[in-house]
Structures are given as C-alpha cells and as structure tokens.
UniProtKB/Swiss-Prot annotation:
Keywords: Ribonucleoprotein, Ribosomal protein
Family: Belongs to the universal ribosomal protein uL14 family.
Protein name stated in the entry: Large ribosomal subunit protein uL14
Entry-linked InterPro entries: Ribosomal_uL14 (IPR000218), Ribosomal_uL14_CS (IPR019972), Ribosomal_uL14_sf (IPR036853)
GO molecular function, one term: large ribosomal subunit rRNA binding
GO CC entries: cytosolic large ribosomal subunit
One Pfam family here: Ribosomal_L14
GO biological process: translation
High-level lineage: Eukaryota, Metazoa, Ecdysozoa, Nematoda, Chromadorea
Length: 140
C-alpha cells in the first residue's frame, strides 16, 4: 500500500525548529468551541528510541481537547500547528517566533472544522494548508 501523503497539505515542507513535544498543551485558535489542545502524537514522525515526537509550524498532529465544549472533549481529533513560541529560521534568513503556541482542529483531509482563526497564521502553514490559509485573518 502506498502512503497517502500529508492530507490536504500542498507544497514542500522545510526543516524548522520543533517546539511542541508530545504532552504539550496549546491554545485552539479557531471558533469550534475548544479552548486548548493536548498533543497526543505527531503525524509522520518515525523517531528514535526514547525521543519524544515533536511538532512544529505546519505539522499535523493527533490532539484531544482539555478545555472547551463538552461535545469536543474526550475525543481524539486531528489538528495543525499555526503558531509556535520556539524561534525558527525562515528560508530568507529571518527568524520569527510568536507569543503563544496555537493550533486549529482539522479533519483527515486538512479541511478546518471551524470557520475562522483568531490571530496570525504563519506563512509556512498557509503555504502547506490552503484551507487554513483561506480562513486566516492575517498571515505572518
């Protein structure tokens, strides 16, 4: 069987600093009713023995909602990282970081469950996930 790829992601993913290991809690930046997301696993990480899989901007991960609407809690969901506090370097040489870690809930195809995103979305994430870019208020 062939691998299905990155869901709804398009374009090439470049290496960035990974700032969100398994067990991290981040803000939910969409209007689904979830307040924060707990990282359970990171999609596409093979890893090494005893090393925690980590997610960075633009990565899809498996999450659960720790605070928010009761119908969203205690379920395993897919999400994508849209902002991270850990500084990373862009291809043009500039470096960027944000004041919070944030993600949005998506389905397996990369389509957002919500209809709006609060705060900026990184350029790297917007290039990879066109459905997220279309709902973003601003792209930084």
């Amino acid at each position: 069987m062939s691998k299905r790829g990155r869901g709804g992601a398009s374009g090439a993913k470049f290496r960035i600093s990974l700032g969100l290991p398994v067990g991290a809690v981040m803000n939910c930046a969409d209007n689904t009713g979830a307040k924060n997301l707990f990282v359970i696993a990171v999609s596409g990480i093979k890893g090494r023995l005893n090393r925690l899989p980590s997610a960075g901007v633009g990565d899809m991960f498996v999450a659960s909602v720790k605070k928010g609407k009761p119908e969203l809690r205690k379920k395993v969901l897919q999400a994508v990282v849209v902002r991270q506090r850990k500084q990373y370097r862009r291809i043009d040489g500039s470096s960027i970081y944000f004041e919070d870690n944030a993600g949005v809930i998506v389905n397996n195809k990369g389509e957002m469950k919500g209809s709006a995103i609060t705060g900026p979305v990184t350029k790297e994430c917007a290039d990879l996930w066109p459905r997220i870019a279309s709902n973003a208020g601003s792209i930084a």
